[in-house]
Amino acid sequence: MAAVLLLFAAAFVYGHGMDAEAASRYTIYVNRKTNIVNVVDAKSGKVVRAMYCSTGRNYSTIRGTYTTVSKMRWHALYGGVYGQYCMRIHGPYLFHSVPYYRTSKNQLETKEYNKLGTQASDGCIRLAVVDAKWLYDNCGVGTKVVIGDTRKLQKPDRKKLKISTASRTGWDPTDPDPANPYYPKLKLKKSASTKLAYGSKASKKFLKKLIKVTSRTTSTADLLENVKVRGKVDTAKPGKYKVTY
């Protein structure tokens, strides 16, 4: 029987963003009690992103309706620490990442990261890096922000992660920087070089079984759910095919 040899090119995409030109469509809702943030499409009313946050201790985060006024890639915060992907809401109140001791990605305050989902800040709204970056990239200056305690917000699909506090510093596990030690790693299994018989099935589900994705924070099964397979294998036509993950 004829056979097909598969050649693979692997590229793992970590996280995703939306068109920044659509930023003006969004309204950001914050619940100080549940410490959840929802980004809602102002036209459709649909939640496009849900996130855990840390608002101010003892409800010290301001309430009301505001519009964002500026953005800063890194910015000094109260207490001599720094935040990534900062967006000013009003006065000293910002959206930003969990604080860092220095403007270096491996200097995150690990204990503070584990407080996401609870009141922990001095008034600003803290987010995981992947979420702070999403707001920074997709919500332009002038985006409406509504902060309160009673609006029921959708919970995030992503589970809250806990990181080791054995060291007072470290990386945010959600930071999409490829240098992040938490960054998912994708490898092809030995079976990826096997030949497929003429006329056999080569579904995307089957092709996913040829790779192994690992992360220090997420199970392989959960990671595979987010892996996209591009390319088509026609086992009725002998030849070489390229499949991208």
Predicted ranges, named:
Residues 1-18, 245:
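Sec-dependent N-terminal signal peptides of Gram-positive bacterial secreted proteins and lipoproteins
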Residues 16-72, 84-85, 167-169:
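Cell wall/extracellular polymer interaction/catalysis modules
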Residues 23, 72-183:
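Exported/periplasmic cell-wall-interacting domains
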Residues 30-36, 81, 139-140, 206-209, ...:
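A short, compositionally biased
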Residues 46-48, 63, 67, 82, ...:
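Extracytoplasmic/secreted proteins, especially bacterial periplasmic and envelope-associated proteins
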Residues 62-63, 141, 198, 238:
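Short, flexible surface segments
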Residues 182-220:
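Solvent-exposed, low-complexity, repeat-rich "mucin-like" stalks and linkers
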Residues 217-245:
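Serine/threonine-rich, repeat-prone extracellular segments and beta-strand-based repeat modules
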